[in-house]
């Protein structure tokens, strides 16, 4: 099941996003960092005032994929789900990919397509392994968009 690969690579994508955007434009990097911070403050507001949880299915299989899902469940508690920070960060990468320009149009387009595919995989994997529901995905996107609007006003 490919969702495991997406989770490992997600952290690389999130970090790489800031490195690349910082190399492209300092002002844009500052906006994205501030937008990210502000969007997480929005998430914290929801986590404190409107805590959410999710009842996950019992994983009874003994195969490697079942063991991996049990491991993910053990390190990622089913609380503070709305908005999804996994999806927020992935959406941040998509938005950044459309703001950055690499040396060639081919590289720029390759990065954009790779980022979209990776991020959509992360969105799907959080749903398919029962870490989030669809509202959490859209909540993460909305939180980031609001954070970016505020960041553009402040910077």
Predicted stretch roles:
Residues 1-80, 89-101, 111-115:
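Hydrophobic alpha-helical bundle signature of multipass membrane enzymes
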């Amino acid at each position: 099941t490919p969702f495991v690969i997406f989770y490992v690579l997600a952290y690389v994508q999130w970090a790489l996003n800031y490195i690349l955007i910082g190399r492209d434009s300092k002002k844009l990097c500052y906006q994205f960092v501030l937008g990210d911070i502000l969007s997480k403050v929005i998430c914290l507001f929801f986590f404190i005032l409107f805590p959410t949880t999710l009842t996950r299915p019992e994983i009874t299989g003994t195969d490697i994929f079942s063991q991996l899902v049990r491991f993910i469940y053990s390190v990622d508690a089913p609380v503070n789900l709305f908005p999804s920070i996994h999806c927020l960060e992935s959406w941040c990468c998509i938005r950044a990919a459309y703001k950055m320009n690499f040396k060639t149009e081919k590289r720029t387009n390759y990065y954009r397509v790779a980022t979209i595919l990776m991020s959509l995989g992360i969105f799907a994997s959080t749903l398919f392994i029962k870490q989030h529901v669809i509202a959490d995905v859209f909540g993460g996107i909305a939180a980031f968009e609001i954070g970016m609007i505020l960041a553009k006003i402040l910077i």
